[in-house]
Amino acid sequence: MEKKCLKQNSTKFVAHYRSLSTTTVAKSNVSTNERVTWFYKIENASDSSWLPFGDIEKEIIEKAFMNHEQQVQLDRCLVNLEENVRINKEDSSFRMPVKRCVGLSSDYIGLRPERFYIPQKLVKSFSDWKSNDRRFINEWQRQNRGLSMNELLEQAADGIIKEGIQLCEPIEAKWIADELLLLKNKSNEEIEKRVVSIYTRESFLYRLVNATLRENDLSKLYNLGAFCWLLFHCDCSSTFLSLGYAGKLYRGAQLDKDTIESYRQAIGLVKTWDAFSSTSKNRKKAETFGNTLFIISLAKSAKYRYSGMDISSLSLYPDEEEVLIRASRNFFVDNIEQDNVTGKYLIYLSLC
């Protein structure tokens, strides 16, 4: 059995690929503008499916392939590029066929569940916190004033490598760290766009960042604070003015009765979500999961011009139509309704 450190693809996420008709192509036929996807085949008594490697795994494999390397090491396996097989690190006799495909759609058919549907913790607004209370990003900033951009990138890279080792993801973590270190001495625009692009990838990073922020886990302040700060400040950067979005947004969730009641009790109050929030402009996709749909608008008295950053153009999944709401953005809880037909709860929020 393979070591289970962190599951990369949920069942729902990979299900889309099971029905795809894919074609392996030779290197000489590939356009540099075409999307390349690497698959491995699972075969057992109940299933025979081609499943995709993770986003970062695919980039690592593709680089090795283009460099004519015979074998590439990933966190969970080896990929032999001469024999086109995926080899279990703990049991080399356990092998799966591998293939390379070009020109597939870049998007998942719906929204990635762990990105768009994980319930956010409803907490008091930032203005309600006492001076001795500490929130993750603000506490990191308080302890790390005066760092240069290069020092920020170095700290972010070093911390992600440390977290990756703890999660049994050292190779994926090193890829992320190397990408960040390549940004040293680059323009702010190039840095910010790449930070957002890295965040959109299906990897351990966005899950870990948001779990840390939701729990306000200050033990990870050094390891994740710099990356969180970089991503947080993209929202108010001139780089993203053209990507600002002020329209209606949607996010699904599966909430228990107590959590729904907490929103009901908060009607008319200002609250916040401590984590970054992935929302979609597409209501139909957002409401396919869970018993609750958040309908998010921009308050007329909002301090900011936009609800969030439309990052779909920087994402490997543009059809998600993702708009990212920054961490700790305050909002009013306006109302709660329950749809008489579907039974789904509709929670209306307006961003301050």
Where are these regions (language model features)?
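Short solvent-exposed strand/turn elements
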Residues: 341-352
